[in-house]
Amino acid sequence: MAPPLSPGSRALIALIRVYQRLISPLLGPHCRFTPTCSSYGIEALRRFGVIKGSWLTVKRVLKCHPLHPGGDDPVPPGPFDTREH
């Protein structure tokens, strides 16, 4: 079981949700990865917290450009993740 979310993680997840609901529908689907960068960001923040989760999210967004092939890029297992990948 993952630890409770910090206020910082909650705030960043809320910002990503605003993007998903208000901005992303206007831009249309253009993410090169599965899961999408915004879904990846939420999962990374939940698994790793605000510092490492933010770092993983920024790295992922920087890879999302036309010169990168994209594809399947899941969030790495977290310290409390007991599922096998």
From Swiss-Prot:
The keyword DNA repair does not apply. GO terms for cellular component: plasma membrane. It is found in: Cell inner membrane. Keywords: Cell inner membrane, Cell membrane, Membrane. Coiled coil: none annotated. It is a peripheral membrane protein. Transmembrane segments: none annotated. InterPro entries: Membr_insert_effic_factor_YidD. It comes from the Bacteria. Its main location: membrane. Could be involved in insertion of integral membrane proteins into the membrane. Belongs to the UPF0161 family. NCBIfam families: membrane protein insertion efficiency factor YidD. This is Putative membrane protein insertion efficiency factor.
